[in-house]
């Protein structure tokens, strides 16, 4: 009987059914990821569940694409799942580069909160697929919005990694030797061998996380730049103007300036230690305002037309 109910729910509303399933997978994965901080044998289970979550989100988005007939990133509900898909992908790629239980332990809570927000806080009418207005029926929708959402995912991962560096070193001075250019755990030694060969040195745990944070933010910055460029081209084609200072456009530009300043200080000024980690961590809130915060206004071309119904919750 229970199995029959699952089948009926899947057939009737596959998108919502898979969405709830993803929430429960994350709910299971959260305590396992915290346990893995003390018992590394649990890390393989965390990675397996994360892969399943990533695949289920892909299945959900493909299902919505088939049902709606357009790329499934046209409303807040769809974009939240796409964002978590990007974060889980980033989590898996970063873990492949440097395996540590800290990475899923900091990423999974954000993934769970995001999916919980999409499942249980958003109004039901915002979860439904709707027909696109003529201006959005463009191949630029796929290119622009997906690139911007992936940039958010990369920037969020970078901020979370920097936060983990600060947390690990909260009671001691933070001295990092990691290279801003991200040389993958190698650094030019001050001493040379008899054969004039530059020898690699091992980075500490915090230095590895700091380097990964820098790399993630660099990827996110490049994607955000591409997102702004494609958005400007699309806006000119659709509305005849490259830039309209829409609230979302303005905050996307502020985010771009913020991370440009961070990268400039890391590369040109050689920033090391606590200051760049604090700046990168605060970038999480910049992205949060850019992505979610402007929707409080309920205005602009990029708004989903929804103001947080907090007064309806009481």
From Swiss-Prot:
<feature type="transmembrane region" description="Helical">
    <location>
        <begin position="15"/>
        <end position="35"/>
    </location>
</feature>
<feature type="transmembrane region" description="Helical">
    <location>
        <begin position="102"/>
        <end position="122"/>
    </location>
</feature>
<feature type="transmembrane region" description="Helical">
    <location>
        <begin position="48"/>
        <end position="68"/>
    </location>
</feature>
<dbReference type="InterPro" id="IPR017562">
    <property type="entry name" value="Cyt_c_biogenesis_CcsA"/>
</dbReference>
<comment type="subunit">
    <text>May interact with ccs1.</text>
</comment>
<comment type="function">
    <text>Required during biogenesis of c-type cytochromes (cytochrome c6 and cytochrome f) at the step of heme attachment.</text>
</comment>
<feature type="transmembrane region" description="Helical">
    <location>
        <begin position="250"/>
        <end position="267"/>
    </location>
</feature>
<dbReference type="GO" id="GO:0017004">
    <property type="term" value="P:cytochrome complex assembly"/>
</dbReference>
<dbReference type="GO" id="GO:0020037">
    <property type="term" value="F:heme binding"/>
</dbReference>
<protein>
    <recommendedName>
        <fullName>Cytochrome c biogenesis protein CcsA</fullName>
    </recommendedName>
</protein>
<keyword id="KW-1133">Transmembrane helix</keyword>
<feature type="transmembrane region" description="Helical">
    <location>
        <begin position="148"/>
        <end position="168"/>
    </location>
</feature>
<dbReference type="InterPro" id="IPR045062">
    <property type="entry name" value="Cyt_c_biogenesis_CcsA/CcmC"/>
</dbReference>
<feature type="transmembrane region" description="Helical">
    <location>
        <begin position="73"/>
        <end position="93"/>
    </location>
</feature>
<dbReference type="Pfam" id="PF01578">
    <property type="entry name" value="Cytochrom_C_asm"/>
</dbReference>
<dbReference type="GO" id="GO:0031676">
    <property type="term" value="C:plasma membrane-derived thylakoid membrane"/>
</dbReference>
<keyword id="KW-0201">Cytochrome c-type biogenesis</keyword>
<keyword id="KW-0793">Thylakoid</keyword>
<keyword id="KW-0472">Membrane</keyword>
<dbReference type="InterPro" id="IPR002541">
    <property type="entry name" value="Cyt_c_assembly"/>
</dbReference>
<feature type="transmembrane region" description="Helical">
    <location>
        <begin position="277"/>
        <end position="297"/>
    </location>
</feature>
<keyword id="KW-0812">Transmembrane</keyword>
<comment type="similarity">
    <text>Belongs to the CcmF/CycK/Ccl1/NrfE/CcsA family.</text>
</comment>
<feature type="transmembrane region" description="Helical">
    <location>
        <begin position="216"/>
        <end position="236"/>
    </location>
</feature>
């Amino acid at each position: 009987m229970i199995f029959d109910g699952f089948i009926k729910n899947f057939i009737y509303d596959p998108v919502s059914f898979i969405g709830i399933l993803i929430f429960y997978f994350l709910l299971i994965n959260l305590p396992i990821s915290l346990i893995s901080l003390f018992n590394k044998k649990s890390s393989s289970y965390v990675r397996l569940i994360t892969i399943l979550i990533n695949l289920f989100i892909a299945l959900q988005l493909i299902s919505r694409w088939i049902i709606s007939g357009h790329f499934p990133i046209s409303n807040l509900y769809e974009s939240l799942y796409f964002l978590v898909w990007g974060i889980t992908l980033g989590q898996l790629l970063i873990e492949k580069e440097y395996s540590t239980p800290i990475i899923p332990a900091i990423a999974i809570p954000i993934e769970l909160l995001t999916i919980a927000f999409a499942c249980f806080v958003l109004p039901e009418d915002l979860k439904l697929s709707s027909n696109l207005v003529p201006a959005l029926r463009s191949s630029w929708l796929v290119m622009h919005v997906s690139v911007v959402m992936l940039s958010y995912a990369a920037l969020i991962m970078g901020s979370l990694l920097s936060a983990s560096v600060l947390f690990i070193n909260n009671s001691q001075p933070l001295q990092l030797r990691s290279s801003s250019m991200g040389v993958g755990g190698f650094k030019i030694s001050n001493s040379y061998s008899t054969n004039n060969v530059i020898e690699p040195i091992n980075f500490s745990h915090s230095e590895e996380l700091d380097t990964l944070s820098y790399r993630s933010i660099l990827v996110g910055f490049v994607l955000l730049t591409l997102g702004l460029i494609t958005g400007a081209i699309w806006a000119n084609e659709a509305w005849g103007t490259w830039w309209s200072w829409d609230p979302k456009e303005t905050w996307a530009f502020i985010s771009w300036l913020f991370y440009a300043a961070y990268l400039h200080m890391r590369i040109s000024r050689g920033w090391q230690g606590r200051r760049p980690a604090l700046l990168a961590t605060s970038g999480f809130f910049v992205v949060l305002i850019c992505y979610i915060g402007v929707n409080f206004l309920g205005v602009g071309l990029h708004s989903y037309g929804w103001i947080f119904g907090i007064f309806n919750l009481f």
